């Protein structure tokens, strides 16, 4: 029964994260014209910052329960960030002849997401 409860916790977080990803991507595409997938880049960076922050706080304090951590990281951030969409968009850009834009997308998503985790961890150390 405990596994089912944990799966429901992850699913609820995933629903919220996926809904946020949809809203961010839709609004971002309206703000920026062009072919570059800014929405995916934004959710991956924001998600990296948030997961770095949560994991650092969890490692250094007891402020976040195991269930809350699971809801926020595996659920919400798992639904918000998206490696599969990023991968598809990158290959699609390359296949459409936008090799530079595809490589830029890959470099920005990877590099800035890694930096995002570092920022999140630093924020966790500052806050707690």
UniProtKB/Swiss-Prot annotation:
One Pfam family linked to the record: CRCB
Localization: Cell membrane
Keyword tags: Cell membrane, Ion channel, Ion transport, Membrane, Metal-binding, Sodium, Transmembrane, Transmembrane helix, Transport
SUPFAM superfamilies with a match to the protein in the record: Multiheme cytochromes
GO biological process: cellular detoxification of fluoride
Keyword Glycosyltransferase set for record: no
Main location: membrane
Transmembrane segments: 4-24, 37-57, 63-83, 99-119
Sequence positions that bind Na(+): 78, 81
Gene Ontology CC terms: plasma membrane
UniProt family annotation: Belongs to the fluoride channel Fluc/FEX (TC 1.A.43) family.
NCBIfam families assigned: crcB
Name of the featured protein: Fluoride-specific ion channel FluC
Organism of origin: Clostridium novyi (strain NT)
Encoding gene per record: fluC
């Amino acid at each position: 029964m405990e596994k089912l409860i944990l799966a429901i916790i992850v699913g609820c977080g995933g629903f919220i994260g996926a809904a946020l990803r949809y809203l961010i991507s839709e609004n971002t595409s309206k703000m920026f014209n062009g072919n570059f997938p800014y929405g995916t880049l934004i959710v991956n960076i924001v998600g990296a910052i948030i997961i770095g922050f949560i994991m650092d706080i969890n490692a250094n304090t007891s402020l976040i329960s195991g269930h809350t951590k699971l809801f926020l990281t595996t659920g919400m951030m798992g639904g918000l960030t998206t490696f599969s969409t990023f991968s598809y968009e990158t290959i699609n850009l390359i296949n459409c002849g936008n090799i530079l834009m595809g490589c830029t997308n890959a470099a920005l998503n990877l590099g800035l997401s890694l930096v995002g985790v570092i920022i999140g961890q630093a924020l966790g150390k500052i806050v707690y």
